[in-house]
Design a protein with these regions (language model features):
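A beta-strand-loop signature enriched in Asp, Gly, Thr, and Trp
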Residues: 228-256
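Cysteine/selenocysteine-centered motifs that mediate thiol-based redox chemistry or coordinate metal-sulfur cofactors
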Residues: 250-303
Length: 318
């Protein structure tokens, strides 16, 4: 756990809220629900002493929300860890302690770190050095910039292909409000083909909670970066996915072509943001147009090629 906490605070140091402080030390508010209390307290306990951070801990389930609001105002950063999607009393607005805090959290979003559904998997999520992840991301982007086309093969005869855009973002735990490291992403405007999707989902729409990590049973057809067909042997899954697609035209658009690069992340079907960093492809649908909801399809396997060069086939080749 100590190494994961050390890696986590390497990301914290690179968060814009800390970079812009221009002074040593920081006052950090750590809040958790009861289910994540042990992990939250381990983060405080194992923080490297050289950072000279001071911590205030609050239990979000029980602490008076007015007191939490005061602590948010006065801190340099707040780190909240809690379960939302996997709770038995799941609510689209989050657990009951969140709505009273929401306006203040929104006001200070630039100093917020939200680790929803991480729990016991915090250790896994931050177990790889961000230096290693950053170097891997740089190599992948450099390889992309030497290529013109991208291909993805699902291993079952299906594939996607498109023209590479050379505008990439790298999430490596440095200088980004999303401090979870392990992703490079771009947009492919002419993505086309048909694939069998197996893996998990990440969205405000709770597909992951209902279906977990699925076998390759969802066939998805894409033309010019829009989902045009879907079918599955699991009729309920097919109906639910169609309902999502038909709810808003923007939900059909492939807004993101992402590659997870955090080698130690596994898929758990928790609707947790760190699962998007699982090695390999994820496609982000929706979220770019008013009324649409972003839905990540995180593939459990497959092969990625830039031009005819294999970049990933279960392991990275760059």
């Amino acid at each position: 756990m100590e190494k994961s906490v050390e890696n986590f605070f390497s990301c914290v140091r690179g968060h814009p809220a800390m970079v812009q402080k221009h002074s040593a030390g920081a006052n950090i508010l750590v809040g958790s629900d009861q289910s994540q209390r042990n992990t939250a307290q381990s983060i405080i306990r194992h923080c490297p002493k050289k950072l000279e951070y001071s911590f205030t801990y609050v239990e979000l389930d029980t602490e008076n929300h007015e007191q939490v609001i005061k602590e948010i105002d006065r801190c340099d950063m707040f780190i909240f860890m809690y379960d939302s999607s996997i709770r038995s009393d799941i609510n689209p607005h989050g657990p009951s302690f969140i709505p009273p805090l929401k306006p203040k959290m929104a006001e200070h979003w630039k100093k917020s770190v939200l680790l929803r559904e991480y729990g016991e998997f915090f250790k896994e999520a931050f177990s790889e050095s961000i230096d290693d992840i950053a170097a891997r991301n740089e190599r992948i982007i450099a390889a992309a910039q030497r290529a013109r086309r991208v291909q993805f093969h699902d291993g079952f005869g299906g594939s996607l292909h498109g023209t590479l855009d050379q505008t990439w973002k790298s999430l490596d735990g440095r200088n980004h409000y999303d401090l979870m490291p392990g992703e490079v992403a771009t947009r492919v405007l002419d993505l086309a083909g048909s694939v069998l999707f197996g893996g998990t989902f990440l969205s405000t729409v709770p597909f992951a909670i209902k279906y977990g990590v699925i076998d390759p049973i969802l066939k998805i057809g894409i033309e010019r970066s829009q989902v045009v067909s879907v079918e599955s042997a699991n009729r309920q899954l097919e109906d639910d996915f169609r309902l999502y697609l038909d709810k808003c035209a923007g939900n059909r658009i492939v807004e993101e072509f992402g590659i997870g690069t955090n080698l130690n992340v596994r898929l758990h079907g928790r609707n947790a943001s760190f699962e998007e960093r699982h090695p390999g492809l994820h496609l982000g649908l929706g979220g770019g147009e008013r009324g649409s909801h972003h839905l990540d399809l995180v593939f459990s396997s497959g092969k990625i090629l830039f031009d005819d060069t294999v970049i990933f086939d279960g392991a990275f080749r760059v």
